[in-house]
Amino acid sequence: QMGLQLQNTAYSVNIKERLDFSCALFDADGHLIANAPHMPVHLGSMGESIKTVIRENAGVMQPGDVFVLNDPYHGGTHLPDITVITPVYLGDAEVPMFYVGSRGHHADIGGNTPGSMPPFSTRIEEEGVQINNVKLVERGVLREAEMIALLQSGEYPSRNPAQNLADLKAQIAANEKGVQELRKMVDQFGLDVVQAYMRHVQDNAEESVRRVITRLKDGAFTLALDNGAQIQVAIRVDAASRSATIDFTGTSPQQTNNFNAPTAVCMAAVLYVFRTLV
């Protein structure tokens, strides 16, 4: 339902027609509970963005607050993918019990080429406006002027801040749909039951992956890229603990272009591989 809300209310073609967006629910610690079948690279990395908001707003977060970020160093992917995060408060609780998040590919966030993905960029500033843990809504009030000012800042500001703001409002609405449905579920079944079932979902997912791991074998692989770099990965399986270590030692260092994968994207790729095996 969050995804349909976002698709129906978004402004940009990327979200409305190309469906380059994702929505998900997270527990109080920022761990994934459930997601729609959207973009794997979003869903495997969004939790790191949630954890950034939790960590950097501990003790100051309030009901009605909504946060926004696209920072690749804090769970983001590339700068056009903007994440909106809404804490979910229940009753008189002083801390959020859940979080809902939506990530959408905006048509432009600045940078030295339209679309904000210049292949010849050598600095992240050349790709557009970088946003980390910015309060988009404060106690229910949209900080529109502050957001427009941020989108118009930096060396290469957004080319269409009004369109960005329209898509951000759609993401806020999608999140609010998730908040409403969570509250309805808690009202119907009780918080203890809802949290118990959420833990069961997480435990079941973990057990499913551990079963897959026991069928895997150690291996090492190298892929040469056409720019002279290489990706090297090794998997080491510990059958006793039913766990695996994925080691990228030997992979080429960061390149002086925009074809680099931040940590969250690497994690998302690994998680997606395990998902396909379950």
What is the predicted role of each segment?
Residues Q1-R18, I54-A58, V68-T77:
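Short, basic/aromatic recognition patches
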Residues H31-N35, G47-D71:
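Regulatory sensory and allosteric helical modules in signal-transduction proteins
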Residues P40-V53, A107-S116:
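A short, polar/charged loop-to-alpha-helix boundary motif
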Residues T83-G91, G101, V237:
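A short, hydrophobic, proline-anchored segment that marks a local hinge/packing element in signaling
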Residues V95-P157, Q254-Q255, A264, A268:
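Gly/Pro-rich active-site capping loops and adjacent beta-alpha segments
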Residues Q130-E206:
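N-terminal leader/propeptide and maturation segments of large enzyme subunits in energy/redox metabolism
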Residues E176-Q254:
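Accessory "access/gating" subregions that flank catalytic or transport cores
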Residues S252-V278:
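Alpha-helical support elements that line or immediately flank enzyme active sites
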